[in-house]
């Protein structure tokens, strides 16, 4: 029986999804990830839960960012904006307020080549989605572990996990369906595609699990206090994402149901923090454990059964 897993973006909230997946401990033929989902995907496909837990509970901000655009304070777990580096970045005309080469090195650490080889040996496919901003309008592309070389695939994971404005925009060439090479400017795959449902259409998956780093009752942004530029940008992006993402989300699930697939969504029980771009080890450890403990909680699970014709 073919089974697939889709994992959404969510930054540090990926620790909660990782704990949930560790509790489920299922085998999947295909795993599709965008943003933080692309980082979870390879080890989740191989059921390497201890290493995945280490990655999502022991990383710090220095493992993600090359320079800090905020600093944590005893009174605020979401951090306080560091204005000077942002002002300097704006004056210099940088594409983002910081870079994330440290994240690329962290991917090297937690996804060594023998795991990539093992994925292919077990015939498991990982698809990671990343957005090309050189295309107008910008377009998401999915890159497969079955078709990419090891170093290139890690680059695509990195591209997928880079949030616009905050982290690196990566310039990298890519090959189209006709074999022609083009140069792209890549960033977060989760901006316009929630979990990559289109990648599973017409492929006869009997069971599809979706780990969403969102709450079932979509948060309303009206009335939220916005303290600075960063919060303004993240709030605006998230508001637009909800409009784009959920407009066709359940319609696509229905299409999968008609095709004979059972779809199970695992939602967050609540909004975990104000800013998912803050990587706090203590908080992420708690989220991993809570994700593990509540994985089978009926309030988190939404099931859509196959529709018989």
Feature names for model-found ranges:
Residues 1-34, 42-309:
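Patatin-like phospholipase
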């Amino acid at each position: 029986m073919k089974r697939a897993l889709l994992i959404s973006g969510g930054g540090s909230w990926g620790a909660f999804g990782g704990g949930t997946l560790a509790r489920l401990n299922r085998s999947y033929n295909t795993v599709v990830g965008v943003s933080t989902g692309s980082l979870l995907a390879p080890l989740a496909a191989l059921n390497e839960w201890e290493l995945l837990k280490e990655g999502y509970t022991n990383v710090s901000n220095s493992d993600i960012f090359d320079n800090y655009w905020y600093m944590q304070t005893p009174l605020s777990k979401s951090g306080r904006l560091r204005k000077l580096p942002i002002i300097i970045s704006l004056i210099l005309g940088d594409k983002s307020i910081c870079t994330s080469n440290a994240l690329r090195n962290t991917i090297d650490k937690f996804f060594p080549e023998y795991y990539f080889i093992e994925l292919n040996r077990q015939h498991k496919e990982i698809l990671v989605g990343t957005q090309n901003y050189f295309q107008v309008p910008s377009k998401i592309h999915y890159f497969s572990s079955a078709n990419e070389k090891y170093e290139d695939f890690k680059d695509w994971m990195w591209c997928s996990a880079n949030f616009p404005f905050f982290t690196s925009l990566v310039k990298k060439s890519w090959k189209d369906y006709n074999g022609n090479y083009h140069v792209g400017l890549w960033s977060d795959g989760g901006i316009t595609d929630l979990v990559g449902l289109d990648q599973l259409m017409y492929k006869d998956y009997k069971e599809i699990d979706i780990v969403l780093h969102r709450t079932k009752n979509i948060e309303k942004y009206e009335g939220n206090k916005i303290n600075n530029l960063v919060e303004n940008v993240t709030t605006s992006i998230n508001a637009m994402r909800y409009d784009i993402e959920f407009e066709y989300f359940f319609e696509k699930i229905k299409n999968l149901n008609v095709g004979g697939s059972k779809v199970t969504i695992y939602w967050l029980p609540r909004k975990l923090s104000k800013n998912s771009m803050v990587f706090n080890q203590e908080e992420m450890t708690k989220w991993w454990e809570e994700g593990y403990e509540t994985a089978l909680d009926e309030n988190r699970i939404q099931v859509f059964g196959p529709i018989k014709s």
